[in-house]
């Protein structure tokens, strides 16, 4: 919706095509043909970048199902455990100090350890002297019941001007975005919440039941370069898989597979 942002998007699309990514520049009419819901904001559009291979889904459902499948393969999950610190001896981590759900302390020992605590990773790594430049960037989402309304988009969309995304999840519309630097607080800023809803109905007046909006906030583990920290550390049995920023689910399976290869002594790929 912003000509300058669209121009930047066109430049970024050209760069990504050089690396094999599918990014097609589309006119306003072409955008509306791909997603008819955009007809309600046609006069606000500058153009679009379309990726046929893009997909979207429900990250919570994916994670829940993945855990269920992992349990079926013999993985044991220890829920409601508070992790206090890592123990180490020389260049080797020797255990994880925890408090279990019965409030009893215990130390879990393993052959290898993976630090995958997102924004909270620095708290355990700092005492070990492992560099970990991660800061929490709070993001917001609003989930709106479509409830028979016909104006919600079917195609996943990104508003480059406002840095928010629209994703249809069955009979719900998920709107997410913003970046708030407020430490580890997960309190909802109602001004930001309302901004998401207001922008949604500016673009898609018949998107759903405005009063049904449910809000959520989470902490994105951001690094200065926006590149995640995946790989070995100075400790021979401690590995990192953290700092994925806004692309945690996008990169989850790929970085997990790459790290598994590294831990097994194989070349990732």
Can you say where each PLM-predicted feature lies in the sequence?
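General small-molecule cofactor/ligand-binding pocket signal
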Residues: 24-26, 76-78, 213
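C-terminal lid/capping helical subdomain adjacent to the catalytic/cofactor pocket in oxidative enzymes
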Residues: 25, 38, 88-90, 146, ...
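Alpha-helix/helix-capping structural signal
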Residues: 4, 29, 119-120, 254
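Short, conserved active-site loop motifs that form the nucleotide-linked donor/cofactor pocket
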Residues: 74-76, 173, 238
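Helical element adjacent to the flavin cofactor pocket in flavoenzyme catalytic cores
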Residues: 7-15, 39-111
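Dinucleotide-binding Rossmann-like beta1-alpha1 core, especially the glycine-rich loop
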Residues: 1-28, 200
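Mid-domain beta-loop-alpha active-site segment that forms a flexible
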Residues: 50-67, 119-120, 192-199, 255
């Amino acid at each position: 919706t912003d000509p300058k942002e669209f121009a930047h998007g066109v430049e970024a699309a050209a760069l990504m095509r050089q690396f094999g990514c599918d990014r097609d520049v589309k006119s306003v009419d072409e955008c509306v043909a791909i997603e008819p819901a955009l007809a309600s904001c046609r006069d606000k559009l500058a153009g679009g970048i379309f990726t046929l291979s893009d997909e979207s889904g429900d990250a919570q459902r994916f994670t829940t199902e993945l855990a269920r499948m992992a349990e079926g393969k013999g993985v044991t999950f220890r829920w409601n455990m508070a992790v206090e610190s890592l123990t180490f001896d020389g260049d080797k981590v020797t255990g994880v100090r925890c408090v279990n759900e019965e409030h009893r302390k215990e130390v879990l020992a393993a052959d290898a350890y993976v630090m995958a605590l997102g924004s909270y990773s620095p708290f355990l790594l700092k005492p070990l002297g492992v560099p970990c430049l991660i800061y929490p960037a709070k993001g917001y989402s609003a989930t709106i019941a479509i409830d028979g309304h016909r104006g919600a988009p079917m195609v996943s969309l990104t508003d480059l001007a406002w840095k928010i995304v629209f994703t249809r999840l069955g009979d719900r519309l998920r709107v997410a975005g913003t970046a708030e630097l407020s430490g580890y607080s997960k309190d909802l800023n109602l001004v930001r919440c309302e901004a998401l809803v207001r922008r949604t109905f500016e673009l898609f007046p018949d998107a759903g039941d405005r009063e049904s909006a449910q809000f959520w906030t989470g902490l994105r583990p951001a690094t200065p370069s926006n590149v995640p920290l995946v790989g070995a550390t100075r400790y021979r049995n401690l590995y990192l898989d953290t700092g994925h920023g806004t692309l945690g689910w996008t990169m989850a399976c790929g970085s997990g597979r790459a790290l598994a290869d590294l831990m097994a002594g194989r070349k990732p790929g």
